[in-house]
Every structure is written in structure tokens, then in C-alpha cells.
Amino acid sequence: IGHYHVTGPALAHVYKTLRANDPGSRLVAFVAASGSAGTLGAGDWLKDKFAAEIVTVEALECPTMLYNGYGEHNIQGIGDKHIPLIHNVLNTDGVVGISDQATDGLNLVFNTKIGKDYLKSKLGVDPAIVDQLTHFGFSSIANMLAAIKTAKSLDLGPEEVLISVATDGSELYTSEKEKLLAANYAGGFTKQQAGEIASRYLMGADTEHVQQLDVVARERIFNLGYYTWVEQQGVSIEDFEIRRSAAFWDALHKMAPVWDELIGEFNGRTGVGV
């Protein structure tokens, strides 16, 4: 609910600012990793207001939505092996799988001097943009790569806009960077190796492991949640099933003003109101 009412409008403001300078632009999709699925609420808002599609991202090493798969991965913070109860699955339009080898590798390129120099000198990336890449952690890189794959899959043009979020920063993964450097690049991380990573995972991002969801695929993903929430966590079948209805989610989104009122009352009673 918070992401629906706060993150969604914030992203819409970004898009409207872009559109003010490019009136012909059109918002096509919101792309974000599932995790606990809260962030996807922003996509629900953007779909309501702009008819944008919602594309979810998951680790290719644990492709729960894509292939009913399982496994371990290193894209920390995006969750795996279950469908979150608050994920509005039947409102989701696509799924993209991203390998943790891509996020691990690009984390090195984005956060080492060798990697940054390669981006600037060989690829001609604006130094100001390179400096901002430190704000992209594993899940943020996954979102970016999934957006690239989505754009290619949908054959989007220059006027068609995808929007995503940088949900974590690289400072969370300094130890992961050092561990990978020690394990795979003990002799030093070279510009050639940075180029190989960027070529394979950034410029080489393709349309593999991208699925546009039809009704059957949405129902398949929704049904996967039964085993986690009903059989294991004890959620009633009625509460599980009601989430199929768009009316349920519409009613949920209308709860924010009620919560605001209750928060105001609580703050007033405790003397912490502003």
C-alpha cells in the first residue's frame, strides 16, 4: 500500500518530468525484482494511471516464476523459492530471469577503477553516469538488466519508456566484491576482463529467459503460492483465493486514508504528532 501511494506517484513524477521535455514519450512498463513484492505495488499504480505493464525480475539460478524452478543465488535482497502473499500476480505482465553471474560481474565493473575507466574510455559512457553507478547494488543491477531485456523483447523504440528503481547500493556488497576479486582475479582485475564482463552481460543482454504472461501463466504462478501460504503458513484458503479478485486489491489500496487517520489519532494521544 505504501509503494502504491508513495513510490508509484514518485516514479510518475519522474516520468512526467521526462515527458515535459519529450511530449511524444510513452510509459510502457515498470520493471522490478519481486523480493517481498512490496515495490511491485508501484507498478500497480503506474498500470492504473498509465496502463503500464508490470514486469517482475527473479534470479535465473532460482527461476520460480519462469520455470517453477528452485536453487541458490547471490542476488541478495530479491527473495526466492516462493510467491509473496502481497504480490498481485494476476496483474503482472512479464517475468525476466537474470543470472547472479551478471550482477556479481557488473558490480566489479561499476565499482573498481579498472572497470570505471573501461566504461569511460572504451564505451564512451559519460563520467557523471559512471559516478552514479555506485548506487547500483545487486538487485538494482538486476533491475537494469531486466529493463534492457524487456526493451529488446518488446522491440521498443526511442519514444517508449521503461521505468525501474535502484533498490540498493553497492556499499552493501563491498565484502562480496572483495571475495570475488580474491577468488577469481587474484592476479589483478584487468581492463580486458572488465570488457569481457560488460560485453557479455551489459551489451550482450538478450531476450533469453523473458516470458510475457498470458492468463494460463499468471494462474500457474498464482497457484504456486498455495504451498507456501496455505499448506505451510496456515493462511486460510478463503484468504488465499480472494487475492485473485481485482476488487480485493482495489479495496486494499483505499485503506491508506484510514491508516493515515489512525496514525494521526495515535500521534495525538501519545503527544508525538507534528
Language model region names:
Residues 109, 160-175:
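ATP/nucleoside-binding phosphotransfer catalytic cores, i.e., glycine-rich phosphate-binding loops
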